[in-house]
Amino acid sequence: MKVLDLDMDYFMTEIASTPFSCEERLDEEYYGDSVWTEEEVRQFLEQNLRLSKNHKIPGRIVTGHNEALIFWKELINSKMLSDPFDVVHVDSHADLGLGDASWSFLQSEFLTLPIDSRRKISEYEFCNKIKGISIGDYLLWAVAYRMVSSITYCANPNGDKNDYV
């Protein structure tokens, strides 16, 4: 099964970036002039993703992109989604955690744990602080949880096409 993972920042001509520690949304003054027109967004959704008012798909709107991972867990637990599944990730950022400490924890400690116990873990210690799954690494966690079998990353056409973080 394929899951569409669509971040609205894809529809910007200038790609916003924030430090991982930032918990609040960027001020609209920072990006307000770079948002695609409604016509451009509709054209992309209808022509590239085959979405329309007549072809609706079930889903959820979330504020923090890492909430998608929580939604996927809910769908799996309710048997509405089976894993592993394929993700079509339409975003200005890859959300694979490079640039944060999670990749190091996942590689050095997490992957040594029994597979059955991995999904119970969503926090780790880094520099004497407890860190959790974030908007910048949730997709990496989904792969580590073995929820995701493949990722098709549709990078923002206005970006450098080399964003794997």
Each language-model region and where it sits:
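Conserved alpha-helical scaffold segments that buttress catalytic/binding sites
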Residues: 1-165
